Amino acid sequence: KILYGNGFNEIIAFESEDINKRDNFFGFWLTDWMRPFENIIEKKWYKWTIGNKNLDITHTSLDKPYCVISFKTWKKFCLETKNNLEIVNKQVVQYFPEQNYFKIITTDNKIYYAQNIYDSRSTKEKKGELLQHFFGINITVADNTFNENKLTLMHFTEEKNVLHFIYILPFSHNKALVESTVFSKDVFHSSWYRQRINDYLKRNNINTFKEQSSEKGVIPMFFAEEKRSVNSNIFNIGIRGGACKPSTGYAFSFLIKQIQLLKSSKKNYVNIHNFLERKMDKVFINFLKNNREDGKSFIKLASNLNGNEFQSFMMGESNLLTKLKIINSMPKLPFIKELFK
């Protein structure tokens, strides 16, 4: 959905959705490559929790906090800093080389030309693969309900045949995004997630709230990159370019890293995740696919790592010692079985 054409020193971004109605949040830890955007971060949390009804593990990172940027803020930033950027609310039907340019045709049969194509369209679904899917609501509640200095990264709840957790971003003492997230092969109706959110809020004595907005999404928990193009002027980016880290679902910050690396590369692709990170992700995801998991493995993992180590794991920057701690945290026999498959 992102196509760049610099033939006339312009950038055109094609987006099939009405982006004026969109206002979701991008979450990430503050890595070095995200620091150039620090001034548009909505909020930072230096503490987060991972747990269930019996146990909470609290992590702290003073130099690499968890951050969010809203889509509206990001769009405004892009439009203000890139004077030659135009966003076109159309879907691209096809594009193909024509002489020294690419000919781009949209659903209304309009034609555009570009020297380079940056393609971030959704990848093909793979049956039987795990998905991370979620639905969240932004709510306003009574004063002093939330601890705005600590986010709930994962609060696991018991659900039949799926891994489920609640994720909460407290923007203030009375405003928060509360999200229901599932790891499974099938996506559910919005009412399923709403019920889990309501149940969680009631268990925490939040019986009255005002819903301001909602958001939902689906992220593949498999390596979903498309085959690299033989044309050096076609760049697959985002999930279709292998930017997403499947085991964690983080994509936005890795897309930024991907673009930064492509700018300095002479090739039309870059490897965002190294061989060992990809191997560990594959083993971890296969473990989740083939074993009943209720979140206890995640809690054990969190208990064996400090905040900076956990952050490095989630953002694909863990060193060898942290990787060994991660492996040691996993159930030994099932994990070893997946390792040698």
Predicted regions: what they are:
Residues I2, T81, L85-F209, E225:
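Predominantly flavin-linked oxidoreductase catalytic cores and closely associated redox partners
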Residues D186-K216, S232-F235, K257-L276:
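Flavin-binding catalytic cores
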Residues Q260-K341:
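C-terminal helical "tail/cap" subdomain of flavin- and related membrane-associated enzymes
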Residues F14-E15, Y118, I237-G238:
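Active-site flanking residues adjacent to catalytic metal/cofactor-binding acidic residues
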Residues P36-T81:
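Conserved N-terminal/central alpha/beta ligand/cofactor-binding core
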Residues I2-N54:
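N-terminal FAD cofactor-binding segment of flavoenzymes
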Residues A224-L288:
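Conserved mid-domain beta->alpha element of the FAD-binding
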Residues N9-E10, K175, N233:
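Residues at the starts of beta-strands that form the adenosine-phosphate
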